[in-house]
């Protein structure tokens, strides 16, 4: 009898402590889910266009986090559309093939040989890696380029001195509608052809913004290598969490937004001006940045809205 009591005395505290720990963990889970619930309800059935690139594409752990975030978005009824670049991998292949990489005004100078490599890497390699990653997690993905189904019509950028660098002339969403209606995730590389059938390399932010506008998306989200829009580019704590469209324009005019952040902010402004609900610039170096931005009160980056 004594030994039975001793055994019970040893077991009961363990059970009690275990139950207490589980309760704490469960409370945290419930809190997270409760915070996410109104956002899940709001965005279910809505379209979110995500530009995927930068560090989030270059590191395996961040890739996995992005793919899981996208799979979760799909599972709660959100309709994500992914647009991607692939600059680092393009540079690696240019180096292998001994083709010099050239940049001017922040854009890749793209001659015919470089364009062949860009198309091979973006359409044939990077796109399929993303599609495969999503498919493995149960998010049915379909790989496309801007040329497929005339999704994006390109035009030469500027005066043509950058070679086969393009801009978006027109977006035709007819090819996307049946894909989205069937629950698939379109994964789109930023290569598109002109009306003459000549392939051009287009900035992926630009492609994402124009597709978001054409789809009348709820959100445009740009994954970047910065926390978002900073009032002081050397001080991450100066992050601006939310801006109105007019305020974003003013920051560009005042030079607060400068350098590589300028085209990203301009991309957001154009998308909002064409009816996108909100545009976000977030730090893709943070694991699960997508979920933190979409499903939490605080978010993680900068959200630009058309009105208060």
Swiss-Prot record:
This is Acetylglutamate kinase. The lineage of its organism: Bacteria, Bacillati, Cyanobacteriota, Cyanophyceae, Synechococcales. GO terms for cellular component: cytoplasm. Catalyzes the ATP-dependent phosphorylation of N-acetyl-L-glutamate. Its EC number is 2.7.2.8. It holds the Pfam family AA_kinase. It is found in: Cytoplasm. Gene3D superfamilies: Acetylglutamate kinase-like. Pathway: Amino-acid biosynthesis; L-arginine biosynthesis; N(2)-acetyl-L-ornithine from L-glutamate: step 2/4. InterPro entries: AceGlu_kinase-like_sf, AcgluKinase_fam, ArgB, Asp/Glu/Uridylate_kinase, Glu/AcGlu_kinase, NAGK-C. Belongs to the acetylglutamate kinase family. ArgB subfamily. The record marks 51, 264 as: Transition state stabilizer. Keywords: Amino-acid biosynthesis, Arginine biosynthesis, ATP-binding, Cytoplasm, Kinase, Nucleotide-binding, Transferase. GO terms for biological process: arginine biosynthetic process via ornithine; L-arginine biosynthetic process. It comes from Prochlorococcus marinus (strain MIT 9313). The gene is argB. Substrate binds at residues 86-87, 108, 201. It catalyses: N-acetyl-L-glutamate + ATP = N-acetyl-L-glutamyl 5-phosphate + ADP. Disulfide bonds: none annotated. GO terms for molecular function: acetylglutamate kinase activity; ATP binding. It comes from the Bacteria.
């Amino acid at each position: 009898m004594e030994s039975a009591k001793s055994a019970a005395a040893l077991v009961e505290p363990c059970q009690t402590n275990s139950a207490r720990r589980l309760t704490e963990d469960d409370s945290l889970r419930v809190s997270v889910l409760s915070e996410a619930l109104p956002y899940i309800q709001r965005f279910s059935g809505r379209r979110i266009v995500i530009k995927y690139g930068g560090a989030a594409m270059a590191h395996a752990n961040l890739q996995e986090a992005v793919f899981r975030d996208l799979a979760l978005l799909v599972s709660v009824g959100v309709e994500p559309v992914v647009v991607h670049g692939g600059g680092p991998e393009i540079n690696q292949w240019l180096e292998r093939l001994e083709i010099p990489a050239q940049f001017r005004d922040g854009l890749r100078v793209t001659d015919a040989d470089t364009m062949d490599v860009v198309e091979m890497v973006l359409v044939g390699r990077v796109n399929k890696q993303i599609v495969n990653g999503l498919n493995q997690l149960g998010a049915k993905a379909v790989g496309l380029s801007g040329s497929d189904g005339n999704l994006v019509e390109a035009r030469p950028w500027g005066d043509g001195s950058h070679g086969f660098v393009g801009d978006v002339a027109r977006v035709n969403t007819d090819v996307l509608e049946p894909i989205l209606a069937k629950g698939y995730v379109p994964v789109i590389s930023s290569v598109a052809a002109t009306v003459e059938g000549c392939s051009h390399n287009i900035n992926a932010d630009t492609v994402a913004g124009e597709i978001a506008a054409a789809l009348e998306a709820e959100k445009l989200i740009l994954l970047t290598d910065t926390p978002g829009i900073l009032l002081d580019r050397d001080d991450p704590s100066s992050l601006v969490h939310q801006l109105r469209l007019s305020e974003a324009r003013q920051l560009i005019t005042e030079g607060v937004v400068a350098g590589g952040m300028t085209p990203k902010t301009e991309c957001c402004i154009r998308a909002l001006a064409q009816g996108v609900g909100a545009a976000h610039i977030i730090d893709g170096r943070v694991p699960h940045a997508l979920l933190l931005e979409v499903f939490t009160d605080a978010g993680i980056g900068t959200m630009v809205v058309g009105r208060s």
